[in-house]
Amino acid sequence: MNTARFTSGVEPAVEIIRIVPGLWHALDDDRVTGRGEATTRPDGRVFLSVDAWHRSVFDQLAGAMLAALPEPVHTVVDETDHELLASWQRAGLTIRRREWEYVVPTATRPASPPRGVTIVPAGSAEDGPLRELDRVVRAEVDAGLGWAAMPAEVLVRPAGDTIVDPAKYAVAAEDGAYVGLVRVTQVTRQPRIGLVAVRADRQRRGIASALLTHTLGVLRQAGIETAYAEVNEANVAATALFESLGARRASSTVELVRHGR
């Protein structure tokens, strides 16, 4: 957790202790007044978070963590949390990317897939072809934007696979192979569209739109009125796709990074 508000008054003098690898405590007379954590994501990137009520405690924790960890290091902040954003910038991190969170209405007009393409509903995709498509998409990302530009949940995992639950994926099939996919997760009552991807050689034919409107239609039939999705502001195609379906921006987060010295 990152602290968003700092209390006023006398700033405490604290001692920063590294408890275990990846965890720091700020101690004021043996009382914990702040915590810092470094988490390594599947692609190897290290993300920082600090929980502290006093600005000076935040600064001391962040400074100790940055001194102990190899760079680059990253953090993610709600863009409306100006104080927290300023705190990380004060520590030397700079904004690297911005993601918009969209609220997506499920009442959309279905988009028909192009001739020869069929939509395989979630839960019906064959495991082998789905994982093969996953490998193709990952290879194309490696050759293009790179995994650092992708959300954490689609990053390559230690086993070399990003498919955790095949039942969450609807796919587009053409000529006996899977050429596109969409994944929906539901951690809360509002479903999250976590990934929409189409093979590079099959893009710009309306496959992504067909997959997405199919998925939204299924949610609508289940009585769900909205879903949400996060889109990198630099991804012009994804932004255009979601906004063409009536999605509206609800909030934004920024990823900050401090590069190696």
Positions of predicted regions on the chain:
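Conserved N-terminal entry element of GNAT/NAT acetyltransferase domains
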Residues: 1-19, 94, 103-125
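Flexible, substrate/cofactor-facing loop regions flanked by secondary structure
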Residues: 8-9, 113-191
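Conserved donor-binding loop and adjoining core beta-sheet/short helix segment
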Residues: 9-69, 74, 179-191
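Residue-level recognition of the GNAT/N-acetyltransferase active site
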Residues: 49-53, 78, 199, 203, ...
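Acyl-donor-binding surface of acyltransferase catalytic domains
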Residues: 52-118, 254-258
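Conserved acetyl-CoA-binding loop-helix of GNAT-fold acetyltransferases
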Residues: 54-68, 198, 204-221, 239-244
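Conserved hydrophobic beta-strand within the GNAT/NAT acetyltransferase core sheet
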Residues: 74-77, 193, 227-231
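Conserved active-site alpha-helix within GNAT-family acetyltransferase domains
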Residues: 79-98, 205, 209, 233-251
